[in-house]
Amino acid sequence: MSITKEEVAEAVRAWCRAWDTHDVSTILAMEAQASGFGFRPFARRDQAAVGERGYLQMLERFFSEMEYFHLRLEDLQTAVIGEVGCAWGRHVEEFQEKGRPPERARVRFTKVLTKGTHGWQVLLYHRDIQPFGDDGRYPRSLTIVSPAPAAT
């Protein structure tokens, strides 16, 4: 079964809609076997290792801790290599955790997907929100290494 760039794009749009509408069953179907990096924790996430039930509980807990959560796709590019879909781009998350101030994150993402008998599956993903300056580059003020103090 051959996949197209357009099908990969529609799968990513469906993923975005599922997160925006809190459609836990669609998220679970697409991500239960995924592994990757999110922008909140530093450590790698492995949904397959926690199992479908464990991931379902994580999703339910995540949404229950939010006053609101919205995700809007901003930019999307896709490619297909054999039976593997690749997607990358940016989306915006607007959310407020209960008891905390509202937040807005412009997220860069990459996804590796495949289409099987149960629909689209995200295999690998990476999301980050590293700050960028007005010129679209990472601010050097965040990466400059301070000189070591002089030995006394």
Label every model-predicted segment.
Residues 84-91, 133-151:
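A short, hydrophobic/aromatic-rich structural module that often spans a beta strand
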Residues 1-34, 140-152:
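Short, low-complexity N-terminal intrinsically disordered segments enriched in polar/charged residues
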Residues 59, 73-78, 91-93, 107-114, ...:
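Hydrophobic/aromatic beta-strand elements that line small-molecule binding cavities or substrate pockets
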Residues 9, 13-16, 56, 60, ...:
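Solvent-exposed, non-membrane alpha-helical residues enriched in polar/charged side chains
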Residues 5-6, 24-82, 103-104:
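A solvent-exposed, acidic/Ser-Thr-rich amphipathic alpha-helical stretch
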Residues 15, 30-32, 38-41, 85-95:
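Short, well-ordered beta-strand segments in beta-rich or mixed alpha/beta enzyme
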Residues 106-137:
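Short beta-strand edge/turn micro-motifs at domain boundaries
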